[in-house]
Swiss-Prot record:
It comes from the Bacteria. The gene is recO. One of its GO terms (biological process) is DNA recombination. This is DNA repair protein RecO. Involved in DNA repair and RecF pathway recombination. Belongs to the RecO family.
Amino acid sequence: MRDRVYRTEAIIIRRSDAGEADRLVTILTPLGRQRVVARGARKLHSRLAGHIELFTHTMLMLAIGRNLHIVTQSSPLDRFERLRTDLERIGAAYYAAELVDRLVEEEAENKRAFSILLGTLRALNAGAAIDLTLRAYELHLLDALGYRPQLYECAACGAVLTEATNRFSPVTGGALCPDCAGVDRLALPMSLAAFKLLRYLQSQPLEISGELRISPATRAETESLLRAYLRHILERDPRSLAFLDDVRQMLRTSSPASVGSSATRYFAQGDTDENDRDPPGAR
């Protein structure tokens, strides 16, 4: 019989208020995604306050409850403090957390997904290139969850892909060879540079991505291709992308105060949106 109290390594990926003083917390653990409750965590002098912040890598002590397991202790292992001083990196962390929240099954063991998210937060905290880190994260996470886009064989006919002019089809699950370009009339054009970058990021360790020197045009193209692929799986864009795009735009054109105001408006919506749940048919 399972012990009534157990310990697990976890990353805090979502929070919301419950009752007068509790917090509902969604965590990613090596054993999958799980919703737990932190009793009294919103009270001023709660010993849990500050120990269940978003994106914190922590060791939790949980008591098995009737409906939700209860957080009895949290011992942070890494708060990723440097990440929290950069608004664009915070937005990237929100996006990374939202993807696992939407795609990882509840209480379905996936140690690799946990490791990928943890590695991504570490890379963002260490100052790695944000966009390339996220592209590598997307590709590795999709692979771990059974959504790996086909980049070495044609997604339609299975022929080995060459460095010819290929197209990318979210509907068929990856790149199309020239002979199959007409299979999906909505397939996206894909440059050779973007094709090579996607294959490289898919095949290399996550931490390598931050060391690459890639042109802005190729970076933007690969982002667009993977957004289209994820949009097909999730049936809409992740909510956090709108904030990340706003931050990037304002960093180029506005003052830091304007960026801070946008963050306040976005995060005033709360850490969670109960409508942002698992997409139908995504698994």
